[in-house]
A protein has these predicted regions:
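M14 metallocarboxypeptidase catalytic domain recognition
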Residues: 17-324
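Sec-dependent N-terminal signal peptides
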Residues: 4-13
Length: 324
């Protein structure tokens, strides 16, 4: 199993420079993760050279869409973060009341605060659905709810965790954090058919430094983590994998973006073990699927590399989002 997984992982030489936030050398980026530059600089983070979308920029961006498209977009706040920041959510629909004949689609990002392309992908997706004629047909078929920055406190300090140190993607059963309670209430009220959770992952892991002569990096632009919980009906598990995720992979192939099912590494008795998938109801992909929804979490290659390949990462998120 280990040999098979390592075969699919691209081996890279890399130099550790502790003072730098970006762990990836430029020559590696240029050769293997070149930027996809066709995206316009229209979202807050793309408009500036440094930093990511901050809270006020997020609110301004949402307000602009509501003002420009009042017949399609509405927004409200589902609750507050632990530090008192109101959590915005968007409803995009051609109908003031949801049409029972349409699919209800839930998309969320920023559940981990150090995964900025998850939020930026959703902001760009909002722009395309509202302003690009190629995507407007979707609103004849779906009603869409977007929670772009679920963990505002963590996002503003580029930290995975909420203000109390809790991982919000391990809180779907205990529901200890106010952010979780707010999102769960909004999710239940919307009752989506399809739920998609945008994330990013760290390509350079501490365990990887012990593999090969120089360490390795995970090369996949996107990894998919859909439910492995056996309490989810088999037909739902099968259709997620063989229809929805399969279509997403085809969309990524068109952009020459690499993908695979999610893998993680961990130490066990001094050895590095790789595992795939997840079955715990604490995480979103399983919790949402246990509500009889078509649910997938996907991870974009991006944590720990700053703004490197940022448009490539956003393109990855858009490809998966629109494929669903």
């Amino acid at each position: 199993m280990l040999k098979k997984l390592i075969f699919f992982i691209l081996i890279f030489k890399f130099t550790f420079v502790s003072a730098q936030l970006n762990q990836e050398p430029r020559n590696i980026t240029k050769k293997f993760f070149s930027e996809l530059n066709e995206l316009e600089n229209i979202t807050p983070a793309l408009k500036k050279k440094k930093g990511f979308t901050n809270y006020q920029e997020l609110l301004n961006y949402i307000d602009e869409k509501v003002q420009n498209y009042p017949e399609l977009v509405s927004s409200n706040f589902i609750g507050e973060s632990q530090k008192g920041k109101k959590i915005p959510i968007l409803h995009i629909s051609k109908n003031s009341n949801y049409d029972i004949k349409k699919l209800r689609v839930w998309m969320q990002g920023g559940l981990h605060g150090n995964e900025p392309a998850s939020t930026e992908s959703l902001l760009y997706l909002i722009h395309l659905i509202l302003e690009d004629p190629d995507y407007k047909y979707l609103l004849d078929k779906i009603d869409l709810v977007i929670l772009p920055m679920a963990n505002i406190d963590g996002f503003l300090k580029n930290d995975r965790y909420a203000a109390n140190g809790l991982d919000l993607n391990r809180d779907h059963t205990k529901i200890m954090a106010p952010e979780t309670r707010a999102s769960k209430k909004a999710f239940a009220e919307f009752d989506p058919h399809i739920a998609l959770d945008f994330h990013e992952y760290r390509p350079f892991r501490k365990d990887f430094a012990q593999l090969s002569s120089f360490g390795i990096s995970n090369p996949y632009d996107v990894m998919f983590l859909h439910t492995g919980n056996l309490n989810v009906p088999e037909n739902i598990r099968v259709i997620i994998d063989t229809l929805f995720v399969k279509n997403a992979k085809k969309s990524l192939d068109k952009l020459n973006l690499r993908h695979r099912h999610y893998i993680k590494s961990e130490k066990y008795k001094g050895e590095i073990h790789f595992s795939t998938g997840s079955n715990t109801a604490r995480s979103s992909s399983n919790f949402y699927a246990l509500n009889n929804g078509i649910a997938t979490l996907f991870e974009i290659r991006g944590v720990g590399i700053g703004k490197t390949s940022f448009k490539r990462r956003i393109n990855s998120g858009l490809a998966v989002g629109f494929s669903f």
